[in-house]
Amino acid sequence: MRIGEVIGTVTLSRVHPSMTGFRWVIAVPFSLAALREGKPDGEDLVVFDSLGAGAGSKIAFSEGGEAAAPFHPERKPVDAYCACLLDQVVVTEQRTTDNGQRTKR
């Protein structure tokens, strides 16, 4: 699962019958460094959205086979799925010491 920011919507002229009544949004993923800065920096992607994410919303999304999991046992043509709307993202930097223990900075 990754975190991204919605930057727009997609309008379809035709859609698979099993996908009617839902939206598609354009999202830009965050790298860890971008999360610290609050600016997305990944490549735009189209995400299936049944939660109503709007422009500027931060979302968590799954991709690939996991994106279709919420519809099981139905088969849906989905490659990226908006799993939740995020109110806040807090990045706490952690490092692993030589002996494998995690420390916070």
Tell me what each language-model feature is.
Residues 9, 30, 64-65:
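Short, surface-exposed secondary-structure boundary micro-motifs
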Residues 37-45:
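Short, structured beta-strand/loop micro-motifs enriched in basic residues and often containing a Trp
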Residues 19-27:
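Short aromatic-glycine-enriched beta-strand elements
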Residues 60, 66-96, 100, 105:
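C-terminal structural segments of small proteins and small subunits
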